Amino acid sequence: MTEYKLVVVGAGGVGKSALTIQLIQNHFVDEYDPTIEDSYRKQVVIDGETCLLDILDTAGQEEYSAMRDQYMRTGEGFLCVFAINNSKSFADINAYREQIKRVKDSDDVPMVLVGNKCDLPSRTVDTKQAQELARSYGIPFIETSAKTRQGVEDAFYTLVREIHQYRMKKLDSSEDNNQGCIRIPCKLM
């Protein structure tokens, strides 16, 4: 069984925990209880492959920002979550993305941009804006509602597919690097 380490990042109050709990336990948590750090595991089948999702739900509050580097180091892929009714949370996405790239020391890190709370009528972030941002980053964009479950599996499963593609790409490039090697058998005398 293949394990995937997913990290859910975003500003406080955007619904990171609600998304994660909706995926893991199939229910919506409507009271806001700020997270420091919670870890969840779930076995799922994605594209015919049994996968173990190791999901780290993180603190969005600024006072916990010092912990971010640590969990960003261990994560393989990131759900970058904003709330469609909170323009500031959308503006914050770039800072999360830049921090992930810095900590991972790479411009190529599996990520999915997630616009949560799409069930709410009071939208301040236009879908087109989010699509444009995701396109400029070269990552998928998915709108979700932790309340109605819309797009929840799609967001997490898309991230797993992004990580899988990333792993295959790294594997291919490491095999390409070995093409020029000459193997010389040695004999012990």
From Swiss-Prot:
Q: Name one GO molecular function term.
A: G protein activity
Covalent lipid adducts (S-palmitoyl cysteine), residues: 181
User: Lipidation annotated as S-farnesyl cysteine: which positions?
Assistant: 186
Residues of the signal peptide: none
Q: What is its EC number?
A: 3.6.5.2
Which keywords does this Swiss-Prot/TrEMBL entry list?
Cell membrane, Golgi apparatus, GTP-binding, Hydrolase, Lipoprotein, Membrane, Methylation, Nucleotide-binding, Palmitate, Prenylation
List the catalysed reactions: GTP + H2O = GDP + phosphate + H(+)
Its biological purpose is as follows: Ras proteins bind GDP/GTP and possess intrinsic GTPase activity.
Which family would the database say this protein is a member of? Belongs to the small GTPase superfamily. Ras family.
Q: Which NCBIfam families match?
A: small_GTP
This protein is called what?
A: GTPase NRas
